[in-house]
Amino acid sequence: TRRLHQMQETPPPVDRGVLMLYNTGALKDPNTYNSILHIADVKPYLRKTEYLIPLDYAYPVYGWGVKFNNNKFVSIVSSEDSSVADNEYIRYERPTFAEILEVKNLVEANFGKPASGNILYHLDKKQLENYAHNEIDKILAY
């Protein structure tokens, strides 16, 4: 697996890889818009280049809450079991279909189509319910 910041490095000695397009932002920064996926965090790493090994792309289809107390990171929480005390708040994050598609289009324009397919991460029925079937199909298409 590769992260965006590793794309300028020499690839490891493997036959193929997966570019992880999630957890792109600063989770613990209270000013972060969405630490799971945000186009502003992805764009600086996109430079038209050919990577030396075939890559597939993994896109996020999950969400979570990031709890802060007095603007200091406390924990990652699920939306079902999250409560807040005084001076606490939760930043809920989930990439929209439009955000995922925008990143997908930019990644493919810069690094090419995936070698054998796209990957959805985190493949969970409850998380997938946040996206329509045709949206999932468009994310997976290559």
Question: Where are these predicted regions, by residue range?
Answer:
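Substrate-binding surface in catalytic domains of secreted glycosidases
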Residues: 1-69
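Substrate-binding cleft of secreted/luminal carbohydrate-active enzymes
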Residues: 56, 62-64, 69-142
